[in-house]
A protein has these predicted regions:
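Ferredoxin-type iron-sulfur electron-transfer modules in oxidoreductases and energy-metabolism complexes
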Residues: 133-153, 171-226
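Iron-sulfur-associated redox domains of electron-transfer enzymes in respiratory
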Residues: 1-155, 164-167, 172
Length: 226
């Protein structure tokens, strides 16, 4: 057993937590895994390919109840939990937060300060493709940027996969679902697409942790994570 599976199995056997949210190997890549028994812990993995932001589940009432749970996530999971705590969306008394280093050693966080220290000293290297895209956009004039985004966002089919994947999009009712009054048309159209994405970006300003889940979820590969 790895350090992760041993730690997870012990937590469930001792009754410290009722559920562990982590990663298991899927058909082609790691995927989220909800572990309820010590035996299931054998499936838990943690490596550089574990990219899903598991914090997205921590605000779901249908998943999170009164029982204490644990989450074993990557850097961005820890960073998101810090933000959710700041916004009073999670109760750390009912949550155990863990990650693992490059050697597979489990790192447990007892306080929000410990999480902050970890994220301050373990920030991943920037994605070269993202840096190249940002550099390209930075060189554009204001008019060129508007044309670029108008063309890109006109392809949006309004599936809202970006919203569903984002751990900081937790409103009970999104503005696109409000129809009295209707601020943004919910269907795909050039103007409403732009309104939706501008609204999404404004709501994420100063809050986004840079996990890239929105762009990863987009079926059209739109550069909405920039």
């Amino acid at each position: 057993m790895s350090n992760i599976t041993e730690k997870a199995a012990a937590l469930l056997k001792e009754g410290t937590v009722k559920m562990i949210i982590g990663y298991e190997m899927g058909t082609e890549r790691p995927r989220p895994f909800f572990c309820h028994t010590a035996e299931e812990c054998e499936k838990l993995i943690m490596n550089a390919e574990c990219k899903n932001n598991l914090a997205v589940y921590l605000t779901k009432k249908e998943i999170i109840g009164e029982d204490k749970i644990a989450v074993i996530g990557n850097y961005y999971v820890v960073k998101t939990i810090i933000q959710l705590y700041r916004e009073n969306q999670i109760n750390l008394d009912n949550l155990m937060v863990m990650t693992a280093d490059e050697n597979g050693e489990v790192i447990s966080f007892d306080t929000i300060e410990a999480m902050k220290e970890y994220t301050d000293t373990h920030e991943p290297a920037p994605n070269p493709k993202v840096l190249a895209a940002l550099e390209k956009i930075d060189k554009m004039s204001r008019e060129e940027r508007w044309t670029y985004w108008k063309n890109e966002l006109s392809k949006c089919i309004r599936c809202y996969a970006c919203r569903a994947a984002c751990p900081l999009c937790y409103c009970n009712r999104c503005i696109t679902e409000v129809n009295c009054p209707q601020w943004i048309e919910p269907w795909s159209a050039p103007l409403s697409n732009m309104e939706w994405q501008i609204n999404r970006v404004m709501h994420m300003s100063g809050r986004c942790v840079g996990c890239g889940e929105c762009a990863a979820a987009c079926p059209l590969d739109l550069p909405i994570g920039l």
